[in-house]
A protein has these predicted regions:
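Extracytoplasmic
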Residues: 4-35, 149, 240-245, 388
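Extracytoplasmic gate region of multi-pass secondary transporters
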Residues: 23-28, 220-269, 273, 333, ...
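Central cavity-lining transmembrane alpha-helices of secondary-active solute carriers
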Residues: 44-62, 262-275
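Conserved MFS/SLC helix-loop-helix module at the cytosolic interface between two early adjacent transmembrane helices
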Residues: 55-98
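C-terminal ends and interior cores of transmembrane alpha-helices
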Residues: 78-94, 293-312
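Hydrophobic core of transmembrane alpha-helices in multi-pass small-molecule transporters
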Residues: 97-113, 313-333
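Glycine-rich segments within core transmembrane alpha-helices of 12-TM secondary carriers
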Residues: 112, 132-158, 374-388
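C-terminal membrane-cytosol helix-exit motif in multi-pass small-molecule transporters
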Residues: 158, 162, 185-207
Length: 392
């Protein structure tokens, strides 16, 4: 049962990340098909989904014990069809306002919010010894949605797929592209994911609890410490994923970045899974500490690769260092998430037993607080997806 729920969750979460980061590919191509948005506006479109995704992760982190994992996964996956359909029609009309694109980009953020409920739900299915690995697989393979989207979308827009309304657009260079396909290609898969979640997942009775029972987790000091640590790792990963293509386009305009953009998120997503598994063996604290040192090193090196006075910079060095940042931000995302699961489970068990509670109550409270903490901390981490592209 646990494995089946995990793999359906991975599929739905992967699709959520595909929708969440749609504008990292779409924004790069908007001005090619007749729009006249400024660079700042395009960066804003890539960043806005992270704002709504982060804010929505707060309520999403509490919904699983209230509605059940099966029901919520099906609902939260199904509603992502709305921004995909809308975006597909919007990009075909060059008169579509920037405000409309802002609204659609905010709706895409619902895909990012799914992470909080998905991770919280999976935490109920696995014991402490396997939580790091399970959460790493769910989060890491779910994060693959970013690289899957950045790989598939450029291919999808290069040819007509949906004959019923696929008129395509002519770029400023005279080429034809079908930008709507970047959004519409996910609709059938979202429908499949919705049905798979509804008929294949489970609502655990042990996972049921009210919002009032979950809110005390916000009073735990460890929650805010771990939120900052997670912001530095996952916030970096999602921020880099959102802004990497646009940053490369501004710094190295001769490079066709969409041929390479998916590599970074792909490396980071796989590294996240590895980070959780490694942390189960060596301890999340040790892995996270070493990882932070490496992240700082790569961040410092990045500045040396950019164009500046008297030199054109080096795209090869820029790309290599950025891949190092994707790798370490992915590893750190997995290791910090493993720390959250271990810390809150341990603290809650000790607190309940100190208050005289029995083992059954302690286990139930530990699962509830761990789930709520995982979701809320993920909300803080997602804010990096807004701030990092804005700094570019």
């Amino acid at each position: 049962i646990a494995s089946r729920n995990l793999w359906i969750s991975v599929f739905c979460l992967l699709l959520g990340f595909c929708v969440w980061m749609l504008f990292s590919t779409v924004a790069v191509n908007l001005n090619k098909v007749g729009f006249t948005f400024s660079t700042e506006q395009l960066f804003l479109l890539t960043a806005l989904p992270s704002v709504s995704g982060a804010l929505l992760r707060v309520p999403y982190s509490f919904v699983i014990p209230i509605f059940g994992g099966r029901r919520w996964t099906a609902f939260s996956t199904g509603i992502l069809i709305i921004p995909c359909l809308w975006l597909g029609f919007a990009v075909q009309d060059s008169q579509t306002s920037f405000t409309t694109f802002m609204v659609i980009s905010l709706l895409c953020g619902f895909g990012g919010a799914n992470f909080a409920s998905s991770m919280g739900n999976i935490s109920f299915f696995f014991p402490k010894a396997r939580q790091g690995g399970a959460l790493g697989i769910n989060g890491g393979l779910g994060n693959l949605g970013v690289s899957v989207m950045q790989f598939v979308a450029p291919l999808a827009i290069s040819c007509a797929i949906f004959g019923f309304a696929d008129v395509g657009q002519t770029t400023v260079t005279g080429d034809s592209i079908w930008l709507e396909n970047a959004a519409w290609i996910w609709v059938p898969f979202l429908a499949i994911g919705t049905l798979a979640a509804w008929f294949g997942m489970n609502d655990l009775a042990a996972a049921k609890s009210s919002l009032r029972e979950q809110l005390p987790v916000l009073k735990r000091p460890h929650l805010w410490v771990m939120a900052l640590l997670y912001l530095a790792t996952f916030g970096s990963f999602i921020g880099f994923s959102a802004g990497f293509a646009m940053l490369t386009k501004t710094q190295f305009p001769d490079v066709v970045i969409m041929h390479y953009a998916f590599f970074g998120p792909f490396i980071g997503a796989l590294a996240r899974s590895a980070g959780g598994i490694i942390s189960d063996r060596f301890g999340g604290t040790r892995v996270t500490l070493v990882n932070y040192v490496l992240m700082a090193l790569f961040a410092a090196l990045l500045f040396l690769t950019l164009p500046g006075a008297g030199h054109d910079g080096s795209f090869v060095a820029f790309f290599a260092v950025f891949m190092g940042l994707f790798l370490t931000s992915g590893l750190g995302s997995g290791s910090t998430y493993q720390m959250i699961a271990v810390i809150f489970r341990k603290l809650t068990l000790e607190r309940i037993k100190a208050e005289g509670g029995d083992d059954a109550l302690a286990q139930r409270e530990a699962a509830t607080e761990t789930s709520a903490a995982l979701g809320f901390i993920s909300a803080i981490g997602a804010l990096g997806g807004f701030f990092i592209p804005q700094t570019f």
